[in-house]
Amino acid sequence: EQVGIPDADRVRILEILESWFVRRALVKASSQGSNRFIVDMLRHLSEQPAERLADEVERFLVDNHTAVGYLPGDVEVRDALTDSNVYWNYRRSRLRMVLEALEDARRGYPGTNPLAMGPIVRDKATVEHLMPQKWRTHWDDGLDEEQGRDRDRRVQQLGNLTIVTQALNSKVSNGPWPQKRAKLQELDDVLITREALTGGDDRAWDEQAIQQRTDRMIDQICRVWPAPEGHV
């Protein structure tokens, strides 16, 4: 029951649980037995006073070290995402959810000082590669075979992905970078895309840029869905 739980604590409980769910999803932690784990947590919480529920939710998750219930720390999240082929390793809906949350964070949502007129509209965008999967058509750059294999892997990394409308996606999908960049700058209002477009020259979107953006996005993920201070 929620009777007697202060509003601030209720929000904090939801934030803690959301971090637990999302972090476990990102590191692909096992969900087998999760129903029983949640029942055990609810049973434990039912014995606690309302004013301590938020602290008890956090403590219950932090103190749990079983495969079914542990809360992944920043290091594990970073290890799972840094070199990951995220485009194919995660369901598209889950990947879009992460990108939408990162976009909301850049817009100042949720928060008391939003920087945009509103959060991004859910479920309207598609996941787009900045460097296209078919990069050999316009992005060959004279790479040798090994470098080509590395680029095939890099284009699926988190740092090469953004969200665009379906209509814009069809206009820019596989084009060369100068035209694609110009079209995105002209028509796209997604802030996580605009960050990738700022600075550098027309040929600056390469493996190094993708890795640097991947690292920044992982940092943001760890802030959007934080672990309790000191949790590793």
Please describe what each predicted stretch is.
Residues 1-101, 201:
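A cross-family structural signal marking well-folded subdomains
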Residues 2-3, 13-24, 41-44, 60, ...:
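Generic, well-ordered alpha-helical scaffold segments in large soluble proteins
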Residues 7-15, 19-26, 36, 72-73, ...:
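C-terminal, well-folded lobe of enzymatic/effector domains
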Residues 27, 31, 35, 40, ...:
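General "foldedness" signal
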Residues 57-202:
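Betabetaalpha-Me/HNH-type nuclease active-site subdomain
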